[in-house]
Amino acid sequence: DNLTKTPLRASHVIMIIMKRSKEVKIREVEEIAAVSCAVQNMYLTTTVYGIGAYWNTGGVTYMEPAKQAFNINEEDRLMGFFYLGKKKGTYLEGKRKPIEESVEWIDDYNTEL
């Protein structure tokens, strides 16, 4: 039931596909990371323009028939759907710790880990 109703909740849906590079041999994990960074940039852009956005990686994303239905090559990967539309309400204000609580700087390269 969610598979048929979820896409209707957004005015636009962008399919996120990682298309493997054939000319240059890049590790798959690096291509997945590159696509993820691109989606993050899309998300940041929608936030600036006040557009609601959501990246869904569930549902049909991991179903093999979906790759066939959308003509996705075997070596490529369906990485989800990016939903766009009018946002309901306002975004919650972020609560961040000072960076010093999350980062440890290493000044000496000879330091044993």
Positions of PLM-derived features:
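Glycine/small-residue-rich phosphate/adenosyl-binding loop
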Residues: 1-34
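Short hydrophobic alpha-helices that are characteristic scaffold elements of the AMP-binding
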Residues: 47-48
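Short secondary-structure boundary segments
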Residues: 18, 57-58, 86
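Short, electropositive alpha-helical surface patch
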Residues: 66-79
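Aromatic/hydrophobic pocket-lining residues that form π-stacking "cages" and hydrophobic walls in ligand
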Residues: 41-42
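C-terminal helix-cap and adjacent tail motif
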Residues: 78-113
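GST superfamily/GST-like fold recognition
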Residues: 26, 30, 51-65
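Structural motif
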Residues: 11-15, 52, 80
